[in-house]
Amino acid sequence: MNRRAAAFAALLIALPALAACGGSGSGSDGGQAGFATDGTFAFAIDSDPGDLNPLVTNLVNAQIVGMYSYDTLIFLDPETAKPAPFLAEGWTESPTKVTYTLNDAITCADGTPFTAQTAADNLNWIVDPANKSPRLESVVPADAKASAKGNVLTVTTSKPRPFMLYDIGAQQLVCERGLKDPKSLSAGSDGTGPFAIDRVVAGDSITMTRREGYTWGSKNSTSNTPGMPKTVTTKIVPSPSTRANLLLSGQLNAAIVSGKDEERLAALKSQPTPAMSGMIVYNHHQGLPTAEAAVRRALTQAIDLDTLTKILTGGKGERAKSLLSVHPSRCAYDTVQGNLPSHDPDAAGQALRAVGKPVDITLVYDNSTDTGSAAAEYVAKQWETAGAAVKLDGGDENYIISRTFAAKDPSGWTASLGLNLQTGTPAIFPQYLSGPAAPAGTNFASIDNKDYNRSVAAAAGRTGDDACEAWAEAEKTLMTSADLIPVSVTPYKMYFNGATALYLPIGGSAIRVLK
């Protein structure tokens, strides 16, 4: 994966492996009497996570594994969407400065203290361009300067950085030994989390063992909390059918399964978590028909987005209300209603005919599922009926990235269906939806929306609810010009057998093994 693609991974979540925050669902079993002592817990991800060093990866599977061995400065409560203590017991924020007051009792798995200076060293390591961390800018601002005084970590930036408290607060942090030898973390761990990595078998599994002395976990979890497993095994299981089989046989305690295999799991408890399951991104590269707003609006008018949602989600999802799909998100707003062009096939046909030249579309789409292929065929049919010529170009998630975001020829695609951006932070979008176009920058769709750029500049200096209102206004400009279209959200389910979770994601201190 090249550097641009690695940076983009911060916005992508492979849905079968998804472990984003969600509600309590039906997965909660009441009472500590039902929890096992020193049990084992096995869960599945859909692909090898690669390098496990949390400072050098944006891959979601690596971050899921990292949640067992590494902690973050703050914990975003899934129920309230508010920050709660984790490594830090207090904090302050302004547009250009955040501080975190660390708990004095934090220790690494080997018993050494974890200090504010160690936290500062983590952030400065990411900022150092020599380390080429994909966490730079996607999480930690390039102009960030981190320092420590006593147990207080201070991070400053030269220009406003919205939601910096949350972004930096969500970075998994490593201990000093790991900072001095980063390569040792590629297949190992050195963190403050409740588990330490024992063994990594590439392409197969990762085994972890519970540490002693862990007392600062979210929801008051400790090393001695009933139900906290002694051993955790992450199994790499690409096939949803195989994941379902392993759940039913008891060889897995937790896994996300979607599609037809869910019918076999009806007797198991589950917890839902929403994710963007459908999005249309138009390529604005000069010379392409979709560089013109009139064409983008017409193509959008040609599609019944309600019908497309039913196809994409198998009837289980709903229309997306904004670009924010992860729960809990930093903001909650509806930028779609009243801003996207409404369904009008006749108007779409008239608009495309008015272009006066052929409208040739190469639609890159996700063909890894039946619903994805059916959705692409539906979209192609509507566009062809309106007068466009459509070429379908399907592949899996990695193929879609290679043809769009990491494409050697940025003009080689016209639109995508299946490149689903996943985030709960609106401030991460400008680096991908504005600025220098690929290959010079990360603006992979060559979007140049001046109203969006002005609105982003206004939103950048705000915090709290005011910031959310400003970011909503910025996002509306993307909808009115049909730059990209959030289509559908699906509640993907994490199924459990012999275990449960206090909340999703199921990392570290959230899991409980049942008797």
Locate the predicted segments by residue.
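N-terminal lobe/hinge region of extracytoplasmic solute-binding protein
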Residues: 44-95, 190
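Surface-exposed binding/hinge segments that line
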Residues: 97-99, 135-179, 194, 198-201
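Gly/Pro-rich hinge or "lid" segments in bacterial periplasmic/extracellular proteins
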Residues: 168-227, 231
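Periplasmic binding protein-like
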Residues: 41-43, 247, 384-436, 466-470
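Long beta-strand-rich cores associated with HINT superfamily self-processing modules
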Residues: 12, 494-515
